[in-house]
Amino acid sequence: TTKKDFMKRIKLLTLSCLMSLSLPSFAQFSPDHKVSLDKGDIKSFIGDKESKGERKVYKGDELTTIGMPVGGICAGQLYVRGDGTLANWWIANNAYNTGYGIDWLLNFDTPLGPWKVCYQTFEPMSYIDQGFKITVNDGNKTITKELNKKDFDDISFIGEYPIAFVEYAQKKQELPVRVSAEFYSPFIPLDAKSSATPATIMKYTVKNTSDKKVTADLEGWMQNLVCIDLKGRADGMLQNKVIDNNGWKSVYMDMRVDNLPAKTAGKNRKYEIFDNFESGNYSRWKVEGTAFGRKPASGEQCNQNNFGGNYGNFLANSYTNYDKPTGKLTSRTFTIRNKYISFNIAGGAHPGKTCINLVVDGKVVMSATGNNNEDFLPRNWDVSEYKGKKAYLEIVDAVDGDWGHISVDNIEFSNSPVDAPTITIDKSHAYFGNLALSVFDGNATGTADDSENNLEYAEAELGKKLNGALTSSMTLQPGESKEVIFVLSWYFPNRPLSYKGSEWNKPLPPNSPAIGNMYANWYNSSLDVANQLRENYAELSKKTHDFHDTYYNQTTLPYWLVQRIMMPISTLATETCQWWATDKFWAWEGVGSCEGTCTHVWGYAQAMAALFPELERNLRERTDYSVSLQEDGGILSRNGEHGILIDGHASVILRMYREHLMSKDNFFLARNWDKIKRSIQYIIREDGNEDGLIVKTQPNTYDISFNGANTYVGGLYLAALRAGEKMAYIMKDTTTANYYKKIYTAGSENTMDRLWNGEYFFQDVDEKEYPKYQYGKDIYQTEAINKALQSIWKFNWTNDVKAQSEAHLPERYYAHAGEPGLFICTWPYSKHPGEDGVRYRDEVWTGIEYQVATEMIKRNIIDEGLAIVKGIHSRYDGKKHNPWNEIECGDHYARAMASYGVLQAVQGYWYDGPKGIIGFDPKIEKNDIIGFFNAAEGWGNISQIRKNGKQTNSIEVKYGRLYLDKLQVTLPEGMNANIVKASVNGKVIPASLTNTNGYTEVSLNGLQICANDKLQIDFE
């Protein structure tokens, strides 16, 4: 088997449940199978795959949901929105659990306000006051505009991760200047440290478009957000300081927790009780429905757990009969005379459905929900704007499912808010740290409080707004442009150890022992971050732009495709990914959701291994083959905890081989070989009789266990054996290699004999003994593999999920009516099993879509594979869903980083670092293509031109270096090259040619190619 064939098989053998969960039958289609055989005009859908196409410019309502991560990898989470404002400020170890993705967990409250997550249409949230404005004077008049959608109605956004480009424009131009901006953090593949800088660069360009000289002031302001999530619950004094850094300016923001002024708020507070329900009746309320009963509840109801914090003996509580009843309480009308309405609330977090509402003039003007727990928390509404108006309250329960209840108590009117319970914090608290807004302009001016000019120091109590600001001034002649570079840097070193995470929609526990952030080993403050960034700005900016240009501008692949492939890779710069101060990479499945860099979900992700292989090797050696490796060779699924998931276990073995291939030598493999053999022996024992089939219980990524022989787990098992065989040969362990090969061969043959029905692979299971979700299909012989992939296209992909989703309601929605998608499971020839079917059967996961598309493209089922990817692109289009946030069990789901496999497939690219081999067999643009390559020590462009009976292949290194001993390519049909000419930068070098196993191999005698060198090989 050639290296090329082997890598195809390895990838293919990881195909998921899609090919293992359809009842094998040749009957007519089941009437409840609603996936149409008519896929539409897919050629029009994917566009011209032989040309690059237009750069995507987002405008108008396409800007709605945009939130592109622009901080460092593993350094928190910060978005730039479609209008160039920043959002989702999870840079202070303050992220929330964004799972589980089900409809009643999409919205919740935070101390800063309502929050939204997962697969719905919304603008990313920001409760931090931050922005930029420009003031321009042309000698006649002065105009000031904020750089956001409020003042610019024709904004353009181009998102090419890691760089976002924003152009500020008005349909009716008022300004004599044009303003544009770039937002990014250093992102340099193969340099994880530089790419993990806790900072965002905001480079503004101002161009005078008039025929007059103008002056312009560009001001950036930023709110001090230190410990802002603790406002109302902790005491501290926010501090802003303007600092002159010898050639650049900063506003440094932190907080002190000592020498605080004595608190007087809350003492002798006067209030009027509207209702605390201690009367034991609803005399002040109109009762509708049955949820709230005929009288107030006396505490928690039957089967209501963890209830506490209510006032007195009675309260309004709609938890009755397991959350099934619904109803509403409507208060008597009252006149608003005080500044605040305060109350205690607990229960469900369903906005508008489990809530208390304030109604003024017939409209709900304020609303609050519970937080999906039973702990009462005080809430304060500032109703001063409605003073003197008539109003009434509604307490609503309109949900009959999970958390379908609301509890309210102690409603008060007052001119001062109820104090929330306070906690004592110090500098070790997870949220404690500092940030800095800087401008690389020594002549800039600054103020510590933007309500006054030129203040060098300002302070405010935690919970009150304190904004610092910097202004850069310029004079522009007609047609002249100037750049101003602002940097937002942060330093929050006390990341808590959150192995267990939190409940859905809750903040990650801040009080766990600190594990720290890796960047705290490199910097001592946010000012230090900004200073080092300034000192190295030219180099870091150039390398980031070099990568951007190499990947986006120099390649000829369809623009939409390269853009989509890179979009989920921004997950590395979200709170899904952490790099601990102990130098350990650790990650969730999605932001705050499902802990422990789990073996099964992360087994799909391909991007980090290609772009930052040191972090994948870190994961293998510091987790999978460290705390997770058991004495018997089993690999625990979640950072040394939980059980062994057999698909994840096999994928770890495969990834060890992948990490070896992305290494420059054999040292990584050699130092781990004994542990690898132990883990392979474990999965062989799961086989039992070495026939290459696993029939015993198989826990896996679907949060269930399979039983019986199948080709989801079975394919991964045989792929792991095949990888083990390859690694054994490298280690000169021939006996072990032959042993693995024997089992692999038996398994491949037995699979074809027992599990192939001529159309797809099925599962061999005793339905009487095991659960009914065990049905199957998958891979092995080439003809069978291709047929099975075509069956997936036929039975699982649709250009509109509406019919199938309405017939078989998914547990969670990741594709809505009118959107295309690939269903995890269908039963085309038998009745859909409903709840007896495999879990998540009716869902659509982008990670699996990328994986299937990768395998289709590798096997020349190209249009269909591209259509699957284009389907993802059409769902995450900006209008409906954030293009940079692919959802599964939580935001920024790691499985979606399988997208990088599509790039490797469409380019027909393979790489063996220790052997110095690159293969290139593009599936599209064969006659004229420029692609992107990544290797152990370098990256750049790889190309192929066919013209006049000749072929030229080139490799241009843009970063690092490349060791290349052999280049394997495919020549056009009918071309039998016998002459090869190789040159580096035009200088001829020795090379020899061999035609073997369907490709042409050029031997280059261990060539070393450095940055900016170009290798060219001409075939005749």
Model-derived segments and spans:
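The feature captures the catalytic groove of carbohydrate-active enzymes
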Residues: K193-S195, I201-K203, S428-V439, G446-E459, ...
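Acidic/polar, glycine-enriched structural segments that form the non-catalytic walls/loops
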Residues: F29-S51, V57-Y58, E62, F165, ...
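Aromatic-rich carbohydrate-recognition surfaces in CAZymes
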Residues: L106-E123, Q130-G139, W522-L540, Q578-K584, ...
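Short beta-strands within extracellular/lumenal beta-sheet-rich domains
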Residues: N313-R337, F376-R379, L470-T471, Q951-N953
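Extracellular carbohydrate-recognition regions
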Residues: K263-R294, P417-V418
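Non-catalytic C-terminal accessory modules of carbohydrate-active enzymes
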Residues: C74, T85-A87, N93-G101, L105-E182, ...
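Extracellular carbohydrate recognition and processing domains
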Residues: V359-A391, V396-I406
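Active-site core of glycosidic bond-cleaving carbohydrate-active enzymes
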Residues: G590-G633, H649, D674, T701-I704, ...
